């Protein structure tokens, strides 16, 4: 009997354990990374970045019809089930306004990354249209290569370079442009030292030495910023005021629950009309996202 992962959204495709034979059929290169655990069961070495990348290629091909996906070495290799959960919970949030999950939603992904993970899942699951912003030239080029390598995505996903290092929405949301929602996986750590310490904890949990490569990777702008996620999301909240009439819902992942109180205080200060928290769980990991809007319920129900 296959065990279910606790806490995933009901529509998440990843409730069951990985079906490695099916995934190898979707991406044959994965076969080279399969090993046996002490119980004699097939698994992969999650400490090997190339194995994790091959697993992601297989998951995206098998579940989301993504035929071409690759990221440069050293960039964040995201856990697909958790990223899918954010998309499904966001769909539920939008459905509260319209009565059903909108099929023509326009979504802005802040810091879409080299992996383009949120647009890939959102396009396949709901047919949404995405704009992905990215500040890193290398990550932007990687994301564009993914779009160009998959027929049909060029009509659903457009990418936009953020050229201002201190801006989030400014320079990305154009005049007269509207979005049903924004989403973001903000940098969590507040310094390079903190990011390294977090990486070392992950390595210890995997039983690895200090010189081992970290399986999920991550560049500086993906992992840390001055002040950590509270500072980043706070800036996002302040900037969102300027686009209050152009975006129905602003949202962001929040890694730590104790980071919520200062964010709630700031949302009250800037005059957010509605604030929502969505709790999520992937296995033992608890996470959440917050959403805020400057529009009342009636205004959000009306099309732009």
From Swiss-Prot:
<keyword id="KW-0949">S-adenosyl-L-methionine</keyword>
<dbReference type="InterPro" id="IPR010286">
    <property type="entry name" value="METTL16/RlmF"/>
</dbReference>
<keyword id="KW-0698">rRNA processing</keyword>
<dbReference type="Pfam" id="PF05971">
    <property type="entry name" value="Methyltransf_10"/>
</dbReference>
<dbReference type="GO" id="GO:0070475">
    <property type="term" value="P:rRNA base methylation"/>
</dbReference>
<keyword id="KW-0808">Transferase</keyword>
<dbReference type="GO" id="GO:0052907">
    <property type="term" value="F:23S rRNA (adenine(1618)-N(6))-methyltransferase activity"/>
</dbReference>
<protein>
    <recommendedName>
        <fullName>Ribosomal RNA large subunit methyltransferase F</fullName>
        <ecNumber>2.1.1.181</ecNumber>
    </recommendedName>
</protein>
<comment type="function">
    <text>Specifically methylates the adenine in position 1618 of 23S rRNA.</text>
</comment>
<comment type="similarity">
    <text>Belongs to the methyltransferase superfamily. METTL16/RlmF family.</text>
</comment>
<keyword id="KW-0963">Cytoplasm</keyword>
<keyword id="KW-0489">Methyltransferase</keyword>
<dbReference type="GO" id="GO:0005737">
    <property type="term" value="C:cytoplasm"/>
</dbReference>
<dbReference type="InterPro" id="IPR029063">
    <property type="entry name" value="SAM-dependent_MTases_sf"/>
</dbReference>
<dbReference type="InterPro" id="IPR016909">
    <property type="entry name" value="rRNA_lsu_MeTfrase_F"/>
</dbReference>
